[in-house]
Amino acid sequence: LHFWLPSTYANAPGPVAALFAIMSKVGIYAIIRFFTLIFPPDSITGTVATDLILPAALITLTLGQLGVLGTASLTRLAAFAAIASIGTLAISIARFDVPGLTAGLYYMIHSTLISAALFLVVDLIAARRGGDIWLRPRPPIRDIGLVSALFFATAIAMVGLPPLSGFLGKLMILNATAGDGWRV
């Protein structure tokens, strides 16, 4: 996930990358359904979700955020942001209780829509600029105001700044993970 997915997203057209971002969240929903049916929390295998998903979620979140900081391509930036949102979502799923799953489902809706929107906006920028490498000087874009406002709005929504829904979703995840001795 951490190595092949950013390249796949970066080389796909914007609408295809947006669809891929949606499909990766469908995989997370499948994990929720699988673990709630096969490994209920009150059974002997109830800790399997936490033991398996939490370390993978923390690694995914860390590598996604490091990728966001280290890339020069806008499409790879959007890809790593989508990976980091999968890690954040998986942390709430690893909680494997009602507050954690509720927070995860709320955040899943937010991150699915914002990830898809970010890929579409980045594709719009790349099409108008002639490339997605933001460090390389390019000619200025006409009507940059609307495009930059769209990028700014989707970027801060992806980060989860208030008053947008990503902030509420991440706050719900933090509240869900604060109980039972979990260190936030």
Tell what function each PLM region has:
Residues 32-36, 64-65, 89-93, 118-123, ...:
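Structural signal for membrane-spanning alpha-helices in multi-pass inner-membrane proteins
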Residues 24, 36, 59-60, 84-87, ...:
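Transmembrane alpha-helical core residues of multi-pass small-molecule transporters
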